């Protein structure tokens, strides 16, 4: 924050001797003689105008202006007078005030943050991209002050904000590239201007993709949105990123994870209203099967299945030499089957229903073996049983004449069919659509409605569906069921907590406990429900515990509203026992 004193401008070591300036002035005169130089009087006037502006001595361009002024024959006395008279010492005053604050006991770091944040807000408010570009052009090279600024997190953050606000500013675009060159590309994912420069974008893409892969499933929810937003910045960024991920997806090691990320990005684009289906098909194997590609593309673009295109695919996938199964393993395409086959009230042409079921079952169950880009075998062992399970559950789910009591009689059949992953996904979607109806819980008399009981079975059989089950339970838990009275709402929420505890018992521990911890911290959940959850969890767990679990769960028990309020039977006190076990076996991190 220190600034230069006025007298420093005449330092001979910095500017060179008067003779050197004179030589340069002669050179300038020769340039004038050739008709290419500027008029000396105009140059002097322009320079004097700059010298008369406030604190011009602090400007980075002061040295070049002085040089031009003296080359044009300007008088040193005028310079000294103007610079001195217009020196108001804004920077030095800030330094002085900062020193006073520190002397009064304010932490130096806090003072620095205050000054920097105020300066950032002023720069964002008054930034002029045209002026920035002109200064940048005049410099002719990367200014030293810019290289110094990008070395600091605070000022990099400023450049990111400015670049978002002024995407066409050349100076900011260049600065973003400089930041990327300096190795900070991991910070640039949210900067849209980075998407305009291939070199920067490819570097940021590589870093972001590596971060997502290293972070694994548990960090996907945190890392993916920013990445998807960057990739979906424009058609060019989407195509480039998906093409690169398509190549990486062919790798034996980590290829499937990259394919998953590519599919999540495609879903993000679809949710934002972009139709990227043609790019998806072009990068897959569809290009070799133009008729199938046309049928798929039509349905994906419209967001709905239709009998004509389904018939085309059905004929191809029941032929002696069907296309690769990968062709129909497009998540957006499979989602359309969920809506057609499992959504309550969905109408499907009975003459074509078997075709819909066959294609979905084929995509879900057929296993192909490939060697050197050539298919050597197709295993259809599970195709028939999968088709049968899909058809059975479809008939149960979409039969509007079957109420909850009739479904109870079919529970054993449903449980058998749920063992097939594709059916479990369909049932999960069906349960979501059904229980999201406003009057659903109002009409239920059972303590545990059959639809929620099905979620327990899905949690038991399919670890990969745990996140979706929890997502549904959280949605229901946070929904305001105003049609129920207060006691009925509490009972319903206890039932939902029972489902969460079951999910925890099936191995999905940290996400469930994390959610309840957030409920406690946000103070928006009836404390009796938190106590109920704690009691139920303590009933199903036993040592040894992982450190991550203890770090999440112990603070819930130690909360003033929880500790000492849970009733115990006899001498057995699970809360005290758990706390004592943790204190003696773990070091808690605040």
UniProtKB/Swiss-Prot annotation:
Pfam families the UniProt entry points to: TH1
Keywords: Nucleus, Repressor, RNA-binding, Transcription, Transcription regulation
One annotated Gene Ontology cellular component of this protein: NELF complex
One GO process term, biological-process aspect: negative regulation of transcription elongation by RNA polymerase II
GO molecular function: RNA binding
The UniProt record lists the keyword S-adenosyl-L-methionine: no
The protein's role, per its UniProt record: Essential component of the NELF complex, a complex that negatively regulates the elongation of transcription by RNA polymerase II. The NELF complex, which acts via an association with the DSIF complex and causes transcriptional pausing, is counteracted by the P-TEFb kinase complex.
Family that this chain belongs to: Belongs to the NELF-D family.
Protein name, entry field: Negative elongation factor D
Species, as recorded: Pongo abelii (Sumatran orangutan)
């Amino acid at each position: 924050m220190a600034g230069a004193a006025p007298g420093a401008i005449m330092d001979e070591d910095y500017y060179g001797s008067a003779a050197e300036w004179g030589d340069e002035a002669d050179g300038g005169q020769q340039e004038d003689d050739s008709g290419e130089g500027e008029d000396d009087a105009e140059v002097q006037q322009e320079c004097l105008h700059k010298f008369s502006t406030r604190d011009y001595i602090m400007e980075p361009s002061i040295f070049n202006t002085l040089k031009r002024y003296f080359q044009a024959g300007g008088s040193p006395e005028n310079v000294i007078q103007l610079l001195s008279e217009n020196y108001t010492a804004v920077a030095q005053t800030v330094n002085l005030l900062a020193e006073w604050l520190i002397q009064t006991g304010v932490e130096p770091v806090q003072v620095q943050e205050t000054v920097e944040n105020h300066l950032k807000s002023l720069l964002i408010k008054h930034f002029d991209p045209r002026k920035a570009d002109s200064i940048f052009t005049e410099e002719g090279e990367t200014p030293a002050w810019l290289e110094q600024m990008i070395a600091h997190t605070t000022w990099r953050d400023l450049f990111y904000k400015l670049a978002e606000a002024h995407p066409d500013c050349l100076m900011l675009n260049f600065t973003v590239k400089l930041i990327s060159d300096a190795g900070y590309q991991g910070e640039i994912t949210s900067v849209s201007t980075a998407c305009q420069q291939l070199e920067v974008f490819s570097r940021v893409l590589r870093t972001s993709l590596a971060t997502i892969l290293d972070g694994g499933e548990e960090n996907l929810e945190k890392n993916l949105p920013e990445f998807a937003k960057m990739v979906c910045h424009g058609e060019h960024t989407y195509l480039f990123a998906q093409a690169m991920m398509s190549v990486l997806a062919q790798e034996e090691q980590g290829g499937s994870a990259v394919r998953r990320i590519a599919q999540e990005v495609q879903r993000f684009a679809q949710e934002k209203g972009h139709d990227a289906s043609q790019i998806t098909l072009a990068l897959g194997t569809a290009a070799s099967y133009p008729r199938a590609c046309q049928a798929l593309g039509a349905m994906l673009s419209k967001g709905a299945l239709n009998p004509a295109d389904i018939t085309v695919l059905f004929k191809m996938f029941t032929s002696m030499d069907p296309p690769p199964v990968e062709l129909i393993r497009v998540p957006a395409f499979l989602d359309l089957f969920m809506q057609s086959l499992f959504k309550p009230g969905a109408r499907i042409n009975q003459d074509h229903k078997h075709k819909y079921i066959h294609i979905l079952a084929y995509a879900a169950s057929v296993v192909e073996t490939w060697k050197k880009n050539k298919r050597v075998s197709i295993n259809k062992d599970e195709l028939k049983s999968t088709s049968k399970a899909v058809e059975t559950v479809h008939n149960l789910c979409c039969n509007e004449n079957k109420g909850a009591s009739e479904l109870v009689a079919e529970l054993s059949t449903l449980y058998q069919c749920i063992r097939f992953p594709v059916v479990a996904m369909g049932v999960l979607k069906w349960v979501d659509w059904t229980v999201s109806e406003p009057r659903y819980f109002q009409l239920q008399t059972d303590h545990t409605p059959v639809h929620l009981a099905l979620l327990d079975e899905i949690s038991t059989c399919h670890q990969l569906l745990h996140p979706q089950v929890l997502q549904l339970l959280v949605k229901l838990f946070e929904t305001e069921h105003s049609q129920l009275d207060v006691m009925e709402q509490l009972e319903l929420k206890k039932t939902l907590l029972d489902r969460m505890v079951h999910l925890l018992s099936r191995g999905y521990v940290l996400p469930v406990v994390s959610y309840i911890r957030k409920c406690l911290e946000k103070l928006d959940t009836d404390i009796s429900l938190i106590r109920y959850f704690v009691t139920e969890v303590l009933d199903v767990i036993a040592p040894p515990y992982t450190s991550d679990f203890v770090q999440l769960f112990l603070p819930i028990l130690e909360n003033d509203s929880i500790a000492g309020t849970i009733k115990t039977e006899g001498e057995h006190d699970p809360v005290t026992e758990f706390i004592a076990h943790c204190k003696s076996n773990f070091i808690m991190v605040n």
